[in-house]
Regions:
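Short beta-strand segments within Ig-like beta-sandwich modules, predominantly Fibronectin type-III
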Residues: 594-599
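Surface-exposed loops/turns
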Residues: 567, 610-611
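Short strand-edge motifs at loop-to-beta-strand transitions and within beta-strands
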Residues: 602-604
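Residue-level detector of functionally pivotal "anchor" positions at catalytic/ligand-binding pockets or at interdomain
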Residues: 541-562, 568
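Beta-propeller-forming repeat regions
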Residues: 1-550, 630
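Short proline/glycine-enriched turn/loop motifs at strand-loop junctions of beta-rich domains
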Residues: 575-580, 621
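Short, glycine-anchored, charge-dense loop/turn motifs used at functional sites
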Residues: 585-592, 614
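C-terminal tail/sorting-segment detector
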Residues: 611-630
């Protein structure tokens, strides 16, 4: 079953895109309609998203699709989409993992198929001091790939190995072969623009290329840990100006070129744009392109920091519309959440689980982010036609991803917990609480030791064709699938994903997690996948989300319950007005006690409850608490 997910920014919504954190952008005509479509690459998870441009004159209309995903090569950390051979098709320059360089894919697409051919690997070289040497570009450095000398072929600017000065690698394709299709470079300038980066902060020193001249430079301990480099004529004088952003700093610095056509010389620096400077943690990268189809390039900005915890999670794609011209731009901030406005985006991380949150017999989605804040997508539809509404409950949990399931079929819910290590702990419910049975359940370990010592395991249990299966999300982005049995080590059966959900990819963004259930009662399991991008992706169905804004929010201190654990009488104190009833449910979602609220403090008689774990729900599920009955 294949679904083309539509996202219509400004006119409609597609909530199930998956969230955005730290993005780079490109343009390419994917559907051959004469309009360049938008490519979005989120480095926090190495996800490439394709948006078809359906906007008319002065209209913003981008529709998300997965149709072209498999045609693109696997991209890592950064990407530049640019046509290096002049054939009208954008090629791909991207980071070469493990080599501190870049590899190149040539666009060899036809009208029938999108296709790329790897032409440079493991890294692109230039002639430097008597030999061909790797053009240095780390995972934390975003290079400028642009025609610097006006001869038509693309040159490269990137910080040198010492990290203080910008090096120019001149493309000699035109000089040697009188064509654009060769990638032959020579380092011709070790201090392009005559500008140097301070060792101590993000200050740039102008008109200097000498160590110790107007700069404090420690040759033994260079500070440079990453930067983004972008060049563009921003004042209409025909000279390429320089935009820089530095790791750990939120802004863009514009350095104005006061040199000439033969030599760049930066003479002035200022925050950019002047009308509303960028303030995005950390190390923003700009991209100039016409977003609203008026023939004038606008500005997109997003964080570039390789550290996933350093980026902005919810307002991480700033769009500035150009009210001027390309020669004399006037960038005015339009939105801080371009494309994110119409999707479910919980910030950093999204770990879903299926639960009847409010005891109404409908399956809801509970989503926890990386910082352990909980949000609920309340099902306001029907059994056959679910529809979700977003509710913030502002509960906080420790980082331990857990799921409840009667694993041993004794009528008591058991508890399975994931952890940072990537293993699982299994607790059996016994009526008085939970007893630890194994802290290495099924010998599950989802760590990828080649890249990390952490796993961030997120478990969920579900039945498929009469068998109990265990899905475990992971830091590396894979969803592992195991067959639960009495054996010490569970059998991995991840191949079953192609049977359960044929259109689901093998790898998602980093810190993946899934919830699996038949949400619409059609006999087919739906799979809801979250990742560090902070959003959700839905497979095997299309279910609407009626309201992407939070309908109501409770603060964590607005309700107090005591004592907990409780023997007979549970006191519920609401510190703000609430309506309707208070409910007590078991963890299957069955309502056991329902009582009207008559005062700010309500006393519930729970003496007849069987000892165990219960859920207290207030104000139609807007706020919930767990308590233990002794």
């Amino acid at each position: 079953m294949f679904f083309l997910w539509l996202f219509h920014w400004g006119m409609g919504q597609n909530p199930w895109v998956g969230g955005l954190n730290a993005c780079q952008f490109g343009r390419m005509d994917l559907d051959h309609d004469g309009q360049r479509d938008l490519l979005v690459f989120d480095r926090h998870g190495n996800r490439l998203l394709c948006y078809i441009n359906k906007g008319g004159d002065r209209a913003i209309d981008y529709r998300y699709t997965t149709e072209y995903d498999e045609a693109f090569p696997r991209l890592t950390d950064w990407v530049v989409f640019v046509d290096y051979d002049g054939d009208g098709l954008e090629d791909i320059f991207t980071y070469s993992k493990g080599w501190a360089g870049m590899k190149v894919y040539h666009n060899v697409s036809t009208a029938e198929a999108l296709e790329f051919e790897l032409v440079v690997s493991p890294y692109l070289t230039s002639w430097q001091g008597g030999g061909e040497v790797n053009i240095l570009s780390t995972d934390a450095d975003y290079p400028a790939i642009v025609d610097l000398d006006g001869d038509g072929d693309l040159d490269i600017l990137t910080f040198g190995v010492m990290g203080t000065f910008i090096e120019k690698h001149r493309n000699l394709s035109m000089e040697r072969y009188d064509c654009l299709d060769s990638l032959v470079f020579e380092r011709t300038d070790m201090c392009w623009g005559r500008v140097g980066e301070s060792e101590e902060d993000n200050v740039m020193y102008l008109d200097t290329c000498l160590f110790g001249y107007g700069m404090k430079v420690n040759r033994d301990d260079f500070r440079h840990r990453g930067a983004t480099v972008t060049v563009r004529d921003l004042n209409g004088d025909g000279l390429l100006d320089l935009l820089l952003a530095d790791v750990d700093y939120p802004g863009l610095t514009l350095l104005v070129n006061g040199g000439d056509a033969s030599e760049a010389l930066m003479v002035q620096q200022m925050d950019f744009p002047t009308s509303h400077p960028v303030d995005l943690p950390s190390m923003p990268v700009p991209f100039f392109t016409d977003i609203n189809n008026d023939g004038v390039d606008d500005l997109l900005v997003s964080p570039f920091d390789p550290n996933p915890m350093a980026s902005e999670g919810k307002e991480s794609v700033w769009l500035y519309l150009n009210h001027g011209s390309n020669a004399h731009p006037d960038f005015q901030l339009y939105t801080k959440s371009f494309l994110q406005d119409g999707m479910l985006d919980f910030g950093k991380g999204a770990y879903p689980s299926v639960v009847d949150w409010d005891g109404d017999g409908l399956l809801d989605l509970k989503v926890r982010d990386f910082e352990s804040k909980v949000t609920v997508l309340k099902n306001v539809g029907t059994l056959q036609q679910p529809a979700f509404e977003l509710i913030a409950v502002d509960d906080k949990e420790e980082w331990a991803a857990s799921c409840y399931y009667d694993v041993n079929q004794d009528g008591q819910l058991d508890l399975v917990e994931g952890n940072i290590k990537g293993t699982l702990s299994y607790y059996q419910g016994n009526g008085d609480g939970f007893e630890l049975i194994s802290d290495f359940w099924g010998e599950v370990d989802v760590r990828d030791y080649q890249t990390s010592y952490y796993g961030y395991s997120v478990p969920t249990l579900f039945e498929y064709h009469g068998e109990l299966l265990l899905c475990v999300g992971s830091e590396q982005g894979k969803l592992f699938l195991y067959r639960v049995s009495d054996d010490t080590a569970f059998e991995e059966v991840s191949y079953l994903w192609k049977e359960i959900c044929p259109e689901m990819p093998d790898v998602f963004g980093i810190h993946s997690a899934a919830a699996v259930a038949d949400l619409n009662g059609d006999g087919v399991l739906e799979v809801v996948v979250g990742n560090f991008g902070g959003g959700l992706q839905l497979y095997n169905a299309m279910i609407p989300v009626n309201n992407l804004g939070i309908s109501e929010e409770w603060d964590d201190m607005d309700i107090v319950i005591f004592p907990n654990p409780v023997l007979s009488q549970l006191h519920v104190v609401a510190l703000r007005h609430c309506s309707n009833d208070v409910r007590v449910m078991d963890l299957f979602g069955r309502v056991l006690i329902e009582q009207a609220i008559t005062d700010s403090e309500t006393v519930l008689d729970v003496s007849n409850l069987v000892p165990g774990v219960y859920l207290l729900s207030l104000d139609r599920g807007l706020v919930n608490r767990i308590f233990l009955k002794r």
